[in-house]
Amino acid sequence: MAIEQPAQSVNVNLKGILLAVIVVCAALIAFSKLWGRRATAEIPKITRGPLHPLTPPITADKVTIAADLRARDFNKLEATLTSYQTAAENNVTQEANVSQAFDAFARADPAFDAPLQEWVKRSPRSYAAHLARAEFLYAEAGNARGAKWASETSAQQFQRMDDYLAAGHKEITATLGINWKVTEAYALLIAEQQVGGSQEDCRKAADAALKEIPASFVIRSQTMFCLEPRWGGSYEQMDQFAAEAQTYVHENPRLAALKGFADYDRGERMNGSDKYVPAIIYYTRAIAEGGDHAAFYRGRGEAFMRLNLNNDGLEDMRRADQLWPQNRDTLQWLAYGLSAREIGKNQEALRELNLAVDVAGPWPYEQQLRAQIVTMLAQSSRDTGASGN
C-alpha cells in the first residue's frame, strides 16, 4: 500500500496537468482566433488600384552582372554599366537602373574581391570599376561591424569596419574624379557620413551632391535616411526636405515618393516593435502620400504576413517586386508567404528563395526558411504518394 499510494497520487496529478494543458491550449487557440479577428477589424479597408510606377522599367539584371564579374568579363561589364550611367545623365529618371546595376556588387561575397581588384588595376580610368569596388567594400564594412548593438560589438569589429569604409571612400573619390555625374557615388558618400559622421556632415555631403544633380532621387532618398529621428533628425525635417524636393518633380516624378518617407519610417518603427496594425496604417498613409514606391508595399506586406494575413501580404510583396525587382527582402517575404500552410505554393516559394540567393548571396535566415520549404515539399510528395495520385 505504501508503494501504491504515491503512484495513485502521481496519476491524479498527471490527469490534472493534462487537463490544465488542454484548457490552456484551447484558450490560446480561442485567443488567437479572437485576436486575428480583432486585428483584421482594426485594419482600415485596403483598396489597391492599378499601379502607377514612378520610374521607368527597371531592366538592369543583378544576376547577370554578378555572373559577368565572376567570369571576369570586364569589357561587357564596362559596356553595360556605362550605358546605364549615360542614360541617367541624359534623363535623371534613368538613375534607377544605375542603382540597380551597381547594387549587384553590394554583397559581402569574398569571391568578388579578387576580380574587382583586377578590374580596377586593369582599368584605372574606369569609374564603373571604382564604383563597383566601392559598393563591395561598403557591404564588407557592414558585414564586419555586424548587426548587434554597439555595446555588443568589439573594438576589432569597428576597426575592420573603418578600414573597409576608408578603402571604399578612396574608390568613391576616384569615381567622382573621373565622372562627377554618378549619383550612386554621392549616395555612398552620404551613407558614409550617416554612419560615421554627424548630422551636419551628412547635410554637407548632401548639399554638395545636390548642387550638381538637384533632381536626383538617389541622392535625396539617401539624405532622407540621415534625417530620420534615429539618426538625430526629425519627422518635421523629413517632411520639409520632401516638400523642397517637389520643385524638381517635373524632372523626376520619383521625387513624389519622398512625401511618404516620414510615415514609412513610422511604419518601420511600429513593425520593429511588433505593432503590426499601426504599422499597416502608416505604410498605407505613405502610399497615399508618396505613391507607388516599392519599399512602402514591402513594409506593409511584411506587417500583413506577421499577422498571418498572407494573401494581403503576398499582394503587396508582388507589387513591390513589380516596382523594384530582384530585391532580396522582397523575394524572401514572397518565399515566406507562398510557403504558408494555407497558401502551399512551395515550389514557387523555393524559386523565389533561390533567386534571392542569386541576387544577394546566402544569409542565416535563408537556410532556416529553405529547410522549412524543403520539409513541406517532402511532406506534400509523401501525401501525394499515399493518396495514389
Where are these predicted regions, by residue range?
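N-terminal Sec-pathway targeting helices
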Residues: 9-21
